[in-house]
Amino acid sequence: MNSQNELHPNWLALTTLPLQLKRFVRAGDPDFIAESPKAVKHQIDGLNGAEAREFYKEVLDAPTTCQPNLPSTHKTAQTRREPERILVPFDKSKFFRLATSNKVEELSQMKASEEDLNSRDSFGWTALMMAACEGATEAVSWLVQRGVQVETSDKSGNTALKLAQRKGHLDVVHLLESLPILEETSEEDESVDGNNPFYCEICKRDYKETPWPIHQTSTVHQFNLKALPAHKLHKFNISAKNRGLQLMVKQGWDQEHGLGPSQSGRLYPVKTVLRKQRTGLGIEQQSARVSHFGAFDLNAVRRRDPIYQPRRTRSDMQREKVREWKRERYLRRVLS
C-alpha cells in the first residue's frame, strides 16, 4: 500500500473468505479465582428419611394383585415345533438296501404298512433277516419296534436269529433273544393267518388256501411282478439314467410310441437279413430269409456240411501253370 486511504488490491477476496477471527481477552486479576458451581441436591419439602423408609416398606409388604408378564409358551412352542416329515412312498428294493446299510433315519422317512415291513424277496428273506445277517443292530431294533414278525423263516428254514448266530453278530443275537416270544399262540396265529383270504393286486386274484408270506415267494407272483415292464425299452436293458433316454423324455416322448418329434419313428431295430450272392441283373433271386428263426424251425440247428474241395499237390499246381502258359501262347498266336 502506498497510502493509508488505499485498499489492498485483493480486498474483495479477503472480505469474502470465511476466516475465523481471533478474539482477545483482557488480562484479569491473578488473585481472583472463580468459584466452581456446587451440585445442588433436590429436596422434597414436608418429608424426611424415616417417613420415606416406612412408605417403601409398606409398598413392598403389600400383596401383589396382578400377574407378572411371563413370556408366552405358545409362541415358543410354535417356534420349536419341528417341521412335519414328508414320507416317501414304499420301495421294496430301496427298503431292503437301507435295512442292510443300517440307515434308520431314511427307513423312518419311508411310508410302510405292516405287510410292507414283512415283505420278502424271491428267496423268502425279509428286511429283518437281511439286517440281522449284515449285523445292522440299529436297523434290527427299529424293525422290531415297528412290530415285524421275528419268527418268520426263509425257504431254507433259517430265521433272523439263526442267520445272526451263523454270522457271529452277538449284539443282534442278544437283541433278538431278549424279545418275549409266545410259543403257545404262535401255532394258532399261523393257522389263523393261513385261513385268512386276501386279494393280490399284482396277480389280480383272490387266494384262500395259500397264506400271504408264501404267496409272495411263489413263482406266479414273481413272474407277474416282471410281466409289466416300466416301458418298452426295458427289455433292451436301457437304464432310466441313460442320458439319451432322459433327453428324449425331456423333449416330450411318452416311452411308448415311436421315436422322433412326431413319434412316428421306428422303435425297434431293423431285422437283419442274410446277404444273398447276386449273379446279375434280370435273374430271379430267392426271397431273403430273415436271420431270426421262427419257433420249432429245424434250420436253426441244422448242421451245414462244408463244400468239398479236392486237395492240390505240387505236381497239380505245376501242371495247371503249364496249361495256363500254353493257353496264353495260343491266344497270342491267333490274335497276331
Curated annotation (Swiss-Prot):
Gene3D superfamilies: Ankyrin repeat-containing domain (1.25.40.20)
ANK repeats: 123-152, 156-185
Entry annotated with the keyword Aminoacyl-tRNA synthetase: no
Repeat is among the record's keywords: yes
Domain of life: Eukaryota
Boundaries of every G-patch domain copy: 240-286
Stored PANTHER family: BAT4 PROTEIN-RELATED, G PATCH DOMAIN AND ANKYRIN REPEAT-CONTAINING PROTEIN 1
Protein name (Swiss-Prot/TrEMBL): G patch domain and ankyrin repeat-containing protein 1 homolog
Organism: Drosophila melanogaster
